[in-house]
Amino acid sequence: MADKMDMSLDDIIKLNRSQRGASRGGRGGRGRGGTARGGGPGRGGVGGGRAGGGPVRNRPVMARGGGRNRPAPYSRPKQLPEKWQHDLFDSGFGAGAGVETGGKLLVSNLDFGVSDADIQELFAEFGTLKKAAVHYDRSGRSLGTADVHFERKADALKAMKQYNGVPLDGRPMNIQLVTSQIDTQRRPAQSVNRGGMTRNRGVLGGFGGGGNRRGTRGGNRGRGRGAGRTSKQQLSAEELDAQLDAYNARMDTS
C-alpha cells in the first residue's frame, strides 16, 4: 500500500492492469488446469458414465432383442400328429353316439294282452336285459310289437333261436335281430309317412269336398239357366206372334 501511495497514478493503473492480467492468467491456468484435472475425472466420470451407462443402454437393447426371441402366445407344436382327428372323438361321446352295443330283437305278432312284465320275464333267462318294452299307441293300446335289448349280442341270438316261431298266448312270435342304425332309420320313416298320410287325407278331404260342392253349385246354376233357356226356346210360333203383336200394340199406344 505504501508503494502505491508513492507511485503515480499511471504507474498504479499499469500495476493494476498487470495484476489483473496475472490473476486472469492464474485463474485461467487454474481453471484450465482444474478443468483439465477436473475435466479428467469429469470426462472420466462422463466416460465412466458412458461406459457404465453403456451396459445400461445395452440392457434394454438386449431385452428388446430377447423380447423378439420370446415365444409367441400361440406356439406351434414341434411334432404334428400324422393323422388329423376331431376333438369330439377324444371324449368318446362322438365315437359311441351312432353305435349301440349289445343285441337288439324286434318281436312282432304279439297278443295285445302281452305286457312289458311278460316280455321281461320271458327273455330275462337268456341274459342281462337293457330294455324290454311293448310298443303302445297314443291311446295306450298295444301295437303287437316289442323291443328286447340285451347287453350281449350272443344272448340275443340265443333268445331268437329259442323263441322264434314259438306261440305266446296262442300267437307265434316273429323275432328278428336288428341293429341300431336300421332301427333308427326305420322309426323316423314311419313317423314321417304317418304324418304325410294324415296330411294328405285332410287335404284331399277338404279340397275334394270343396270341389264337389263347387261343382254341384255350378252344375245347379248351369242346369237352372239351361232349363230357363230351353223353356223359352220351346215357345211355339203362334205364341211368339202373339207376343210380337202385344209389343207393337204397346208401342202404338205410347
Curated annotation (Swiss-Prot):
Pfam families: FoP_duplication, RRM_1
GO molecular function: C5-methylcytidine-containing RNA reader activity; mRNA binding
SUPFAM superfamilies noted in UniProt: RNA-binding domain, RBD
Extent of Basic residues compositional bias: 214-226
GO annotations of cellular component type: cytoplasm; nuclear speck; nucleus
UniProt main location, coarse: nucleus
One biological process term in Gene Ontology: RNA splicing
Keywords on record: Chaperone, Cytoplasm, mRNA processing, mRNA splicing, mRNA transport, Nucleus, RNA-binding, Transport
Gly residues biased stretches: 23-55, 203-213
Domain spans labelled RRM: 103-180
Family: Belongs to the ALYREF family.
Function of the protein: Functions as an mRNA export adapter; component of the transcription/export (TREX) complex which is thought to couple mRNA transcription, processing and nuclear export, and specifically associates with spliced mRNA and not with unspliced pre-mRNA. TREX is recruited to spliced mRNAs by a transcription-independent mechanism, binds to mRNA upstream of the exon-junction complex (EJC) and is recruited in a splicing- and cap-dependent manner to a region near the 5' end of the mRNA where it functions in mRNA export to the cytoplasm via the TAP/NXF1 pathway.
Summary of subunit composition and partner proteins: Homomultimer. Is part of several complexes involved in mRNA processing and export. Component of the transcription/export (TREX) complex at least composed of ALYREF/THOC4, DDX39B, SARNP/CIP29, CHTOP and the THO subcomplex; TREX seems to have a dynamic structure involving ATP-dependent remodeling.
Protein name, entry field: THO complex subunit 4
